[in-house]
């Protein structure tokens, strides 16, 4: 079974599943899950293939979640090894998706095969929620599957998302929550004119700069035991016609909050509007809530995971909520306990993405031990 983890990861990498394509990855997994007693349900929404596979109907219901889609490779000539080769060299498995997250998918599947073979009458239920829309707009993937499950009253109790959570060594970090993400799109109106006649124009860049300074210097909260303080970052500023002698008529600013559980997205929106109004700006502002913050505190899932990592690696893991968002946010909103555990993330989305074969083998052992801790 040890070599099987690597072989399966290679086979998945060799399928060019650039988001939202699945390229047959889910079928490969489904065939093996069905062989060990899982009921398979394929859910296709618009351009996205999703799989819901479940074995058992009882609680506790433990779910492995992940994605088969990968980000584009960029120019393949920049890669040391072809990005869809799945080549193993010097103890590293190379290819797009090796770390994010086809390696995790292989480890989940093989761990589950081992577990159900040893424990055909295990407690509770095991499921897999797999999508090909995590790296894309996340419209027709996990969120649609969750909607389907909720509509028929199917509840996940605990979920492990295989995102690459580890930092320096396998298992050193488990994400037991994530910050919320809120994006604002601001348009400030001015009056276009000639730069030599500023008295006849209103420069929206000049008008907006003090407000942006205040927003960037505002302390939104102080975080808490589990979350760092909420952060505000400006990501894009666009103004001007391209000509050097024209005062622009409007300014567009895009910004993002990564927010803790100490503040709500509504409170952030209200505070931003109050600041903009204090500066007497003529503006339009729209918002996208990309995800709400979630937190899984110590309990069966976290404790089983910490214990498994210690057993396999000898490490005492760190529980963190830093980093970006993941599909875990859609699952957590149902009340499920959610964590993220996967390989090291140093090469994700980069040229020459790779993962240690030893790490994948150990990750499979950790996943299997988590199942042992929870369902036997």
Swiss-Prot record:
It comes from the Bacteria. Zn(2+) 2 binds at residues 100, 135, 349. Pathway: Amino-acid biosynthesis; L-lysine biosynthesis via DAP pathway; LL-2,6-diaminopimelate from (S)-tetrahydrodipicolinate (succinylase route): step 3/3. Its cofactor is Zn(2+); Co(2+). The keyword Zinc-finger does not apply. InterPro entries: ArgE/DapE_CS, Bact_exopeptidase_dim_dom, DapE_proteobac, Peptidase_M20, Peptidase_M20_dimer, Peptidase_M20A. Zn(2+) 1 binds at residues 67, 100, 163. One of its GO terms (biological process) is L-arginine biosynthetic process. It comes from Pseudoalteromonas translucida (strain TAC 125). Catalyzes the hydrolysis of N-succinyl-L,L-diaminopimelic acid (SDAP), forming succinate and LL-2,6-diaminopimelate (DAP), an intermediate involved in the bacterial biosynthesis of lysine and meso-diaminopimelic acid, an essential component of bacterial cell walls. The gene is dapE. PANTHER family: ACETYLORNITHINE DEACETYLASE, N-ACETYL-L-CITRULLINE DEACETYLASE. The active site is at residues 69, 134. This is Succinyl-diaminopimelate desuccinylase. It catalyses: N-succinyl-(2S,6S)-2,6-diaminopimelate + H2O = (2S,6S)-2,6-diaminopimelate + succinate. Disulfide bonds: none annotated. GO terms for molecular function: acetylornithine deacetylase activity; cobalt ion binding; succinyl-diaminopimelate desuccinylase activity; zinc ion binding. Its EC number is 3.5.1.18. Keywords: Amino-acid biosynthesis, Cobalt, Diaminopimelate biosynthesis, Hydrolase, Lysine biosynthesis, Metal-binding, Zinc.
């Amino acid at each position: 079974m040890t070599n099987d983890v690597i072989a399966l990861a290679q086979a998945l990498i060799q399928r060019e599943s650039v988001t939202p394509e699945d390229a047959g990855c889910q079928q490969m997994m489904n065939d093996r899950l069905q062989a060990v007693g899982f009921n398979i349900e394929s859910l296709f929404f618009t351009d996205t293939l999703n799989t819901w596979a479940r074995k058992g109907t009882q609680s506790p219901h433990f779910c492995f979640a992940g994605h088969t889609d990968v980000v584009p490779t960029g120019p393949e000539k920049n890669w040391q090894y072809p990005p869809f080769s799945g080549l193993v060299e010097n103890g590293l498995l190379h290819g797009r998706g090796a770390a994010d997250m086809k390696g995790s998918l292989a480890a989940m599947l093989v761990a589950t095969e081992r577990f159900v073979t040893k424990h055909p009458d295990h407690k509770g239920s095991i499921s897999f929620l797999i999508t090909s829309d995590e790296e894309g707009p996340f419209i027709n993937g996990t969120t649609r599957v969750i909607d389907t499950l909720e509509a028929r009253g199917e509840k996940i109790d605990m979920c492990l998302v295989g995102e690459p959570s580890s930092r320096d060594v396998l298992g050193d970090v488990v994400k037991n929550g994530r910050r919320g993400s809120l994006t604002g799109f601001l348009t400030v109106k001015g009056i276009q004119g000639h730069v030599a006649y500023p008295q006849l124009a209103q420069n929206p860049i000049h008008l907006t700069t003090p407000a942006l300074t205040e927003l960037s210097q505002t302390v939104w909260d102080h975080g808490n035991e589990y979350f760092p303080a909420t952060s505000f970052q400006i990501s894009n500023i666009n103004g001007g016609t391209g000509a050097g002698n024209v005062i622009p008529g409007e300014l567009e600013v895009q910004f993002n909050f990564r927010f803790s559980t100490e503040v709500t997205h509504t409170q952030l929106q209200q505070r931003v509007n109050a600041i903009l109004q204090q500066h007497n700006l003529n503006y339009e502002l729209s918002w996208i809530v990309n995800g709400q913050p979630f937190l899984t505190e110590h309990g069966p899932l976290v404790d089983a995971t910490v214990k498994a990592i210690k057993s396999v690696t000898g490490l005492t893991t760190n529980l963190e909520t830093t980093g970006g968002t993941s599909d875990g946010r859609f699952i957590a909103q149902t009340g499920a306990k959610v964590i993220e555990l996967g390989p090291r993330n140093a090469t994700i989305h980069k040229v020459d993405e790779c993962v240690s074969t030893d790490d994948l083998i150990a990750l499979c052992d950790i996943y299997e031990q988590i199942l042992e801790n929870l369902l036997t």
